[in-house]
Amino acid sequence: MRRIALWMLCLALALLCAPVCAAQGEQASLRIAASADLHVNPAYRTTGIVNPLEPYHLQLVDAFMWDAKQQEADILLQLGDITNQGKRTQHEALIEKLRQAEAQGMAVYVLPGNHDIGEVSTGEFAGLYADFGYGEALSRDVESLSYSALVGDTLLLLLDTNGYSGHRDTAFLTDGTLRWMEGQLSRARDMGWQVLCAGHYPLLTSNSTPFSGKERAAQLLEDYGVQLYLCGHLHKRCVTLGESLTELVVDQAIAYPCCYALIDVEEDGFRYEPQATAVSEWAAQRGEADPNLLDFDAYQTRLEQARCAGVVARLKGEQELTAQEQREAEDFFFKLSDYRAHGTLSRYAGMLREHPGCDIMIRIGAGTIYSRWIPSVLSDAVPYTTGFTLQGGKIDTLASPQAQP
């Protein structure tokens, strides 16, 4: 509670010192840096088969938190799967990093994902993260790890969407949790608070886990005029529009291209912009000697190209491809992955459909998920993944620099 009081004091002083025009109607915004799926595990000794950047994931967590501070974030929001297996040692390693972020002046809020309750119970989880949301909650749900927190005139409604049945991928929201959720929304409406809701599992996108209570939760948010729901779980940025609710699946800050979400809470809405972590700048100011960290963009691009080439090779198997066809397939698949990761896929979807490597990938991927996934990803691309503003339930795309085809 002390750090929120400090934040409010700083905000009050800033308002007192602000120009007269600010006193005539402008509202100081609250800036939130959000990420999901950090999967912290100090014992990682992998070659990065699932995520090529896994060997550097602890450094990338540090770089992300440092970058968030450089972007003047007030709040660091972690949307679940903050550890890899829910082991106490993993939680303790993350908590040490969160304390460092807090010491830099950022308030920290966490919620659990499907990987976070393992060796620790739900009660132990809340105790471990008492300084990062649970000990400062305005209200806590008695049936889950859901809670709310009030920051200024913004209510953070943080949902625990995980089911604790012993099966990692089970998810649900109980009737009791939904009643608690509606109570928080009703209170916010009565008090005139703006609501930002978040959870680990998506509620709107069709590309995620179906679970009990999902549709009812989304409808509650629509009914109470909530404009934005943040989540993770998919490890890839995704924007899905409801009737008046926008869902943003935030980036995984430890995987290519190492971005996170910057959310500005404004007077009647939100502004979202993806932010690339300046890993090389972080490494240089820390005096790191590792050349991969010091030229990180080039390093992670090489790894992503190699990963995409590996996918092509596995799909090809014993099938006959000329050297030119293989190069075209690799070029297509890397561009598809790269544009999707950077949020520019809708801009280049038409070009990629005409790319000679597109038909080759679908052909060699026949009978696999890729033959369905590639057309689906190209058709589902939306322009809002480069950033957007929300005002009164209306979404507008932020202008973004043109990527290189």
Indicate residue ranges for each PLM-predicted region:
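Bacterial N-terminal signal peptides
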Residues: 8-16
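Acidic/histidine-rich helix-loop elements
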Residues: 36-61, 85-86, 119, 123-140, ...
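Extended active-site neighborhood of metal-dependent phosphoesterases/phosphodiesterases
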Residues: 88, 92-179, 242, 246, ...
